[in-house]
């Protein structure tokens, strides 16, 4: 149940199928009949998890095929872009298909954005939703939702926004990082999918995680993403550049608290290479983890009103206000300037 609430069932299923996670079914009774029931229940559970594993593999293959087609399209038309979160994160897992897939998020800098719109609409014959509710347009292709970002993340401070945008655009122009997928157009050859460099990738995933935690709430899926990212990039992240950038965008205290949480609850090593944590960081680590566990995937576990409408919008706003007060000292400027807007956007999306 917990795995479902936090959208990490694929990770559990993969672990069980590979023999790295043991399955036990408990029963208060101790009898031969009870033992037989437990064995049957265990067999049913394992079979269901095997089905989950197969479904995840099929879904990942579909995402890979479509994303390879997208990368081929962008490459042919010389469009600068990066894919982030989602499929880019999945590549850091030991088995990419174990991570639950959602949307395909990609960013195109302003210099290429309008041309990219025309290329996608013409080549894929899709209608792109251009409503500027948040920071991206959206469209569906082959049953997969694409979010086409004109801005990767939004900040309350204009100064912070300009610094962040400049950093991201410089990284996109360099085009040094990516991952390979089997080319859907070119047969047996592979196509390179552009992604952010380790330091920039961490900043984006962390900032996205923290903002969701403040508004709707955030679950283990997104939190495990950060743990995997920090572990896999431990020798590639430029610590001085990272900490300086986080200070420039007003999120350094929040990141320190995250590191404390990762060290305490996820046994992350090497935290000292970033900074020396203090007592306040440790205190916020406990608060962060408690909020993650009570939230579930994007806060759905904590909602009382599951249907859309005014009740859901009011509940979203109420919950966000409580989170903002609890974590105000971790990112005060953005909470004051940006979060009210994020609450309004999130509430409107739930109407």
Q: Model segments located where?
A:
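Conserved NTP-donor binding/palm subdomain of two-metal-ion nucleotidyltransferases/polymerases, i.e.
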Residues: 1-29, 37-102, 108-351
């Amino acid at each position: 149940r917990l795995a479902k609430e936090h959208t990490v069932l694929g990770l559990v299923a993969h672990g069980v199928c590979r023999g790295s996670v043991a399955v036990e079914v408990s029963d208060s009774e101790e009898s031969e009949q009870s033992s037989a029931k437990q064995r049957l229940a265990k067999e049913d559970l394992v079979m269901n998890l095997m089905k989950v594993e197969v479904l995840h593999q099929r879904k990942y293959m579909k995402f890979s095929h479509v994303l390879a087609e997208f990368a081929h399209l962008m490459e042919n038309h010389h469009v600068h872009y990066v894919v982030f979160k989602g499929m880019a994160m999945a590549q850091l897992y030991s088995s990419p298909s174990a991570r639950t897939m959602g949307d395909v998020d990609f960013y195109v800098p302003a210099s290429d954005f309008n041309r990219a719109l025309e290329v996608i609409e013409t080549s894929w014959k899709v209608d792109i939703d251009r409503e500027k509710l948040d920071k991206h347009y959206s469209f569906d292709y082959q049953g997969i939702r694409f979010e086409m970002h004109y801005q990767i993340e939004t900040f309350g401070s204009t100064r912070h926004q300009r610094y962040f945008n400049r950093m991201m655009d410089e990284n996109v122009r360099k085009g040094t990082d990516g991952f390979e997928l089997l080319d859907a157009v070119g047969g047996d050859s592979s196509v390179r999918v552009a992604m952010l460099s380790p330091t920039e990738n961490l900043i984006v995933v962390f900032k996205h995680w923290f903002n969701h935690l403040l508004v709707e709430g955030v679950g283990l899926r997104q939190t495990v993403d950060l743990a995997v990212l920090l572990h896999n990039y431990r020798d590639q992240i430029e610590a001085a550049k990272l900490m300086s950038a986080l200070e420039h965008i007003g999120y350094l205290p929040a990141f320190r608290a995250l590191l404390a949480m990762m060290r305490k609850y996820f046994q992350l090593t090497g935290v000292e290479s970033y900074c020396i944590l203090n007592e306040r960081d440790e205190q916020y680590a406990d608060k962060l983890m408690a909020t993650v566990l009570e939230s579930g995937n994007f806060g759905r576990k904590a909602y009382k009103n599951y249907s859309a409408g005014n009740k859901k919008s009011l509940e979203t706003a109420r919950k966000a206000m409580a989170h903002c007060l609890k974590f105000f000292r971790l990112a005060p400027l953005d909470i004051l300037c940006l979060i009210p807007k994020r609450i309004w956007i999130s509430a409107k999306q739930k109407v």
